Amino acid sequence: MSVAEIFERVDKNKDGKISWDEFAEAIRAFSPSITSEEIDNMFREIDVDGDNQIDVAEYASCLMLGGEGNKEDEDIVMKEAFDLYDIDGDGKISASEIHVVLKRLGEKQTIAECIAMVRAVDADGDGFVSFEEFKTMMSCNNKKLQ
């Protein structure tokens, strides 16, 4: 099952984000005796931007952090997350693709803000986020969590 498929199963109301209640329901399915406090701690750790919802990028980052997986597993999860943003499948993410995905997730970033996001990680200056640049960006996010 892919990252996107798992995310969609947990996202019961299909709004593109996982609420605390959706998260708690999924966690309790695997660990019925877990306390609400433990769920809160896990949720806060995954919810990097602090908006009280887990988006697909935060979820993918969590999977990479939490597992005992190897580099190959990490690359597979990373590629699936990248593909969610690479709408046209051309192997690179544009500012407009980021804008579309974020809009679907209920975010309100402007196209100008999305262009700034791309520029922040665009190491080769081509105006797009390559898979390698995406991996670097996600690795930086993971280090902030640890």
From Swiss-Prot:
Annotated residues for binding of Ca(2+) 2: 47, 49, 51, 53, 58
Residues that, per the record, bind Ca(2+) 3: 86, 88, 90, 92, 97
Superkingdom of origin organism: Eukaryota
Binding, Ca(2+) 1: 11, 13, 15, 17, 22
Positions that bind Ca(2+) 4: 122, 124, 126, 133
GO molecular function terms attached to this record: calcium ion binding
The keyword Calcium is annotated on this UniProt entry: yes
Keywords attached to this entry: Calcium, Metal-binding, Repeat
Calcium is among the record's keywords: yes
SMART domains in the cross-refs: EFh
Disulfide-bond pairs as recorded: none
InterPro entries: EF-hand-dom_pair, EF_Hand_1_Ca_BS, EF_hand_dom, EF_hand_pair_protein_CML-like
Limits of the EF-hand domain: 1-33, 34-69, 73-108, 109-144
PANTHER family linked: EF-HAND CALCIUM-BINDING DOMAIN CONTAINING PROTEIN
Function: Potential calcium sensor.
Protein's name according to its UniProt entry: Probable calcium-binding protein CML32
Annotated source species: Arabidopsis thaliana (Mouse-ear cress)
Gene assigned in the entry: CML32
